[in-house]
Amino acid sequence: MTFNNKTIEELHNLLVSKEISATELTQATLENIKSREEALNSFVTIAEEQALVQAKAIDEAGIDADNVLSGIPLAVKDNISTDGILTTAASKMLYNYEPIFDATAVANAKTKGMIVVGKTNMDEFAMGGSGETSHYGATKNAWDHSKVPGGSSSGSAAAVASGQVRLSLGSDTGGSIRQPAAFNGIVGLKPTYGTVSRFGLIAFGSSLDQIGPFAPTVKENALLLNAIASEDAKDSTSAPVRIADFTSKIGQDIKGMKIALPKEYLGEGINPEVKETILNAAKHFEKLGAIVEEVSLPHSKYGVAVYYIIASSEASSNLQRFDGIRYGYRAEDATNLDEIYVNSRSQGFGEEVKRRIMLGTFSLSSGYYDAYYKKAGQVRTLIIQDFEKVFADYDLILGPTAPSVAYDLDSLNHDPVAMYLADLLTIPVNLAGLPGISIPAGFSQGLPVGLQLIGPKHSEETIYQVAAAFEATTGYHKQQPVIFGGDN
């Protein structure tokens, strides 16, 4: 029996009525994962034994009728710590790391009765935009296995889009939830910085990282955010949760809402069919009663340059701990302490990770700090101020999630700058700490196009409201890839 076409609420009703058990649902999910895994490579670890133990305990305790996520399987990105389950960040450096604790987001999900069924593939240490830098091999796009799934949360997106799981967790440092959500035709939200605790997330860029949910629909995405969002004393940057229920505005109309469309988001480098899709979406919002007007975010063009200085500098610091002594892989060919450090890091890290560590170390080095890192921080402030000016007059910002649809595997691996530019529309949101969502908005060349909605801090309720209004009146979310069982 398969349940991949059932919504979370439908699954909840089946569990409460005892038509199925949590164990049966978990077993069916594990079978879904295994049957599609050879085609996708979306998982690093399938946690079958642990998941079935969890499911049995939930069945014995009884499904919580008031908790819609009780007994629901969950896939977790492999840089989010899971007690007793390998957490490798898709790196040789952490090939044998098994945490003895859960990340707060995972602990929160388990408290709601969710069952962790496995750890999803990703770009190594979340550094990459295509899902190809993983030590465990590239993940494939759910719609076309010759295309990239996006990154860095490649496996989490492909797993949901293909029907392996209904819900998954990812992390977003410069677009790593929204871009793969767009490439795979599902819903991915990067919450306001601090909404979801970073405790237990293997750090990349600490001022940018945020854990967030993937789901096939807007409401299911919001239900998962309800479960994982919390203030956390273990994360000094976490913020009080200001929204009791992220689904509360879903279903309300959007008449009179003001939506900004930045001219920079439809300019040079944007695929013409993607641009046309977003302009059509803008017209659709107007039909729903919203007011859509063109605005300018003049400093957004510097976002990629600013991001790669700041994120790489933070990564250079965060990844110092992986040295073959305190953490991680240790080279066997070392004859002294210096060689242990050098050889372990040279062999344990992949090329993209080493590239970013070098860039970050250079940016922070004496004589270059003011010219690079300090300057990047100043321009980051200008990007934040651009957003603040727009949000003084508008409720949300609309634009494409990515400049193009999913591209061929191995087509940009040898051109890091081109790969970095694929995140030019998502990066500014992280630099400003804002929430942003990607939802399906159409197709180009048979591949999904993602629409991005950006809001001021702590506006997730409004983002979900507007996203759900679009979803309910278009139906793009109902189209599924062949591997799911739908029509491509």
Swiss-Prot record:
A GO term, aspect molecular function: glutaminyl-tRNA synthase (glutamine-hydrolyzing) activity
Pfam families: Amidase (PF01425)
Keyword presence, ATP-binding: yes
Active site: 77, 152, 176
Transmembrane segments: none
GO process terms (BP): translation
Catalyzed reactions: L-glutamyl-tRNA(Gln) + L-glutamine + ATP + H2O = L-glutaminyl-tRNA(Gln) + L-glutamate + ADP + phosphate + H(+)
InterPro entries cross-referenced by the UniProt entry: Amidase, Amidase_CS, Amidase_dom, AS_sf, GatA
Bridged cysteine pairs (disulfide): none
Enzyme class: ligase
Subunit structure as annotated in this protein's UniProt entry: Heterotrimer of A, B and C subunits.
Family label: Belongs to the amidase family. GatA subfamily.
Protein name: Glutamyl-tRNA(Gln) amidotransferase subunit A
